[in-house]
């Protein structure tokens, strides 16, 4: 009982809500740019996708954070997941400075669905060695749905959904362009993006080309980290037709990432990270080993108005190819090719009295093929579909929402028998032939109630479903980028989640505050654990530690709190705190906590908007921010899988201004210094934390990026 009381008390103290951006509008001007001022717009003016279709944020019973265009533009980052990782309840699993995986309330990988251009992104997201294949510059705004969101998105949305919204279509008769360029000092990151969009008599288009390159990053303990350089290129073209009866949009997207692979090997005497003779750590060129990721995407988006309702049909094709080059630049070892076809058909009714109903079907077909000489997973084929119905109802000061969904998924993995190097030895069976079918039901029921004109109470109960992915079921190979050899388990059962969310939102002219609590019970929670032999020694396969997937019942509790106080018109003081306690039930002490649980985190900042004449400079601001990660003592210790992570605090400084000429904005300039004190630290979710020990200092692993100065210029062009 004492444990329960402590957990409830901790939830009450630490729990939370959404980010400051929840109070931001999402309207953009004709150049896809927003002014720099912080506005305190009421929550009932913000419209989000939600779990049951478009609705006002204030009426959504589920916890949702919104990241505005202004925040994305002004916040320095190395990729799109890094850009949103400062939102309460959102973290990132990193492998160096350029690779990030999203984590929502302690859960990541295939438990977070990423939606872009209206469809779920499919890029072999079970892997650690690559991030989300989306150009950060192409994202206009972001919605983060926290908690089981399987109603609209199906299996895998157990932790939540991240919706990356592209820029809205320009008003009729308008054209606009945008040029962006930035630089970061620590890893020499240089990025740029060119955008041209328009709307002529209903013919709409949006074109964007972006590029990015970075050399090895550095920190106080490791110096330059060999293998952390990367290059990125992307191109997007949207063409469409808007008419009175609806719209048809075709979006073509290409993304290419070439990241290095950090191996963490050191000189035993000096502890310095090993580099090839004559290697220049500031080189932007490719150095072995490295990866190559190509992602192609074509999305056809159709919508037709039917009376006051509408029908929407989405169809998409994605091709993801991931290659690893270890010994030669011309011949890859690992070569995975994934084909995905997405489909989504749904109908949204007009208002039927106080009710609005949506129903539909969506799913995907996949085929993955090994084209290289090394293997992680077998060739496989997957098909799934989901039938869903949702409803919302507004009664006086109360808004009700809910729905049900049924999912079916079938997955078949092919056998693979390899030739043995020894002609006299038997052939080796790498993968066995197998087929699995998974069925699951999801549902939610929630309420948002206006207690007072500025105070809203929210409660939501949701149940989700997640089928095991191909890596969890059948992997048998080494992850070069994380130095792990992983073994799957074809007997794994689907995860089933049931979560309770409680929240309070308060908004006034002086204070904005959000509080969100959650308690989540998951059956058959799947994770990997390090294998040990009968003597307690780590099992080594092909030179790497060996991990195998297993499952157990889990309970996650916690929340986020956000408070923004602006006692003066130009002064904003913001604080947020995030906490999650992730426990595996019925286990001994060393296996009590789930792996990769983010540490408790406090984010605070003081922002002052400087008064200008408005003729040359406008919307000028300066902001001092603190990022404090507390010590993480709740870790999965079985087999030495994880270790405790010390606390650390980062001090950051940001500034920005609009530059005007003849009453028009001609540019926006942003500058920052992150990690001002050049603190050497490791985040608990960093994959590099568990690399080789530096025998000269006794420190384990590779540390995160040190002090980093950034500058960014955005030039809007009206045509």
Please identify what each model-predicted range represents.
Residues 673-675:
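Gly/Thr-rich phosphate-binding loop signature of adenosyl cofactor/nucleotide-binding cores
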Residues 613-617, 661-666:
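Short, solvent-exposed loop/turn segments that connect beta-strands within catalytic domains
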Residues 24, 36-42, 50-67, 71-75, ...:
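Outer-membrane beta-barrel proteins, especially TonB-dependent receptors
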Residues 84:
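Active-site-adjacent helical/loop segments in soluble small-molecule enzymes
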Residues 1-33:
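Cleavable N-terminal targeting peptides that direct proteins into the secretory/outer-membrane pathway or into
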Residues 89-93:
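A short linear hydrophobic-aromatic micro-motif
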Residues 657-658:
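Localized edge beta-strand/strand-to-loop motifs within extracellular or lumenal beta-rich domains
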């Amino acid at each position: 009982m004492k444990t329960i009381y402590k957990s409830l008390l901790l939830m009450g103290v630490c729990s939370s809500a959404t980010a400051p951006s929840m109070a931001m509008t999402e309207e953009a001007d004709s150049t896809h740019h927003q002014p720099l001022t912080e506005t305190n717009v009421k929550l009932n003016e913000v419209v989000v996708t939600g779990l049951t279709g478009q609705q006002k944020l204030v009426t959504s019973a589920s916890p949702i954070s919104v990241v505005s265009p202004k925040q994305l533009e002004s916040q320095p980052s190395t990729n799109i997941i890094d850009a949103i990782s400062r939102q309460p309840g959102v973290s990132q699993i990193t492998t160096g400075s350029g690779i990030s995986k999203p984590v929502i309330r302690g859960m990541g990988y295939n438990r977070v669905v990423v939606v872009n251009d209206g469809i779920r992104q499919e890029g072999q997201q079970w892997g650690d060695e690559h991030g989300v294949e989306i150009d950060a510059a192409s994202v206009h705004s972001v919605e983060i749905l926290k908690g089981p969101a399987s109603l609209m998105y199906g299996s895998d949305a157990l932790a939540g959904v991240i919706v990356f919204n592209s820029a809205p279509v320009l008003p009729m008769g308008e054209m606009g362009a945008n040029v962006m360029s930035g630089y970061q000092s620590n890893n020499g990151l240089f990025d740029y993006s060119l955008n041209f969009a328009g709307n002529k008599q209903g013919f709409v288009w949006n074109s964007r080309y972006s590029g990015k390159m970075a050399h090895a990053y550095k920190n106080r303990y490791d110096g330059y980290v060999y293998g952390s350089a990367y290059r990125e290129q992307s191109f997007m073209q949207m063409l469409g037709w808007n008419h009175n009866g609806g719209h048809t949009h075709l979006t073509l997207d290409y993304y290419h990432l070439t990241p290095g692979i950090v191996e963490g090997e050191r000189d035993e005497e000096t502890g310095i990270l090993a580099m090839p003779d004559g290697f220049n750590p500031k080189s932007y060129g490719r150095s072995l080993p490295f990866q190559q990721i190509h992602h192609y995407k074509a999305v056809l988006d159709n919508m037709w108005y039917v009376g006051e309702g509408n029908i929407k049909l989405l169809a998409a094709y994605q091709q993801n190819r991931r290659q690893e080059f270890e010994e030669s630049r011309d011949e890859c070892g690992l070569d995975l090719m994934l084909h995905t076809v997405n489909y989504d058909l749904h109908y949204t009714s007009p208002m039927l009295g106080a009710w609005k109903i949506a129903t539909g079907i969506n799913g995907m077909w996949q085929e993955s093929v090994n084209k290289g000489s090394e293997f992680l997973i077998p060739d496989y084929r997957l098909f799934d579909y989901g039938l869903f119905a949702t409803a919302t109802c507004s009664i006086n000061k109360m808004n009700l929402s809910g729905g049900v969904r049924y999912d079916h998924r079938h997955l078949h993995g092919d056998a693979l028998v390899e030739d043995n190097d020894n002609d006299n030895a038997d052939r080796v069976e790498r993968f066995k032939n197998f087929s699995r079918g998974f069925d699951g039901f999801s549902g939610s029921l929630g309420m948002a109630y206006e207690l007072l004109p500025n105070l809203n109470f929210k409660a939501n109960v949701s149940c989700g479903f997640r089928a095991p992915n191909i890596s969890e079921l059948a992997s048998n190979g080494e992850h070069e980028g994380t130095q792990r050899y992983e073994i799957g388990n074809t007997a794994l059962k689907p995860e089933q989640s049931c979560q309770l969310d409680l929240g309070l939102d308060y908004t006034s002219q002086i204070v904005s505050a959000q509080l969100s609590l959650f308690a989540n019970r998951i059956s058959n929670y799947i994770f990997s654990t390090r294998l040990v032999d009968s003597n307690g020694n780590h099992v080594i396969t092909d030179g790497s530690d060996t991990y195998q997937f297993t499952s157990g019942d889990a309970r996650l509790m916690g929340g986020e709190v956000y408070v923004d106080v602006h006692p003066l018109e130009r002064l904003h003081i913001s604080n947020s705190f995030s906490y999650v306690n992730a426990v595996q039930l019925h286990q001994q002490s060393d296996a009590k906590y789930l792996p990769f649980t983010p540490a408790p985190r406090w984010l605070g900042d003081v922002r002052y908007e400087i008064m200008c004449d408005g003729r040359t400079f406008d919307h000028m601001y300066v902001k001092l921010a603190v990022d404090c990660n507390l010590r993480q003592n709740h870790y999965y210790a079985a087999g030495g899988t994880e270790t405790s992570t010390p606390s650390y605090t980062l001090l950051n400084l940001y500034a920005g201004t609009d530059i005007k000429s003849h009453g028009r904005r001609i540019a926006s300039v942003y500058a920052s210094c992150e990690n001002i004190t050049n603190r050497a630290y490791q985040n608990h979710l960093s994959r590099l934390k568990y690399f080789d020990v530096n025998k000269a200092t006794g420190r384990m692993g590779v540390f995160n990026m040190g002090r980093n100065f950034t500058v960014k210029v955005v030039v809007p062009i009206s045509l």
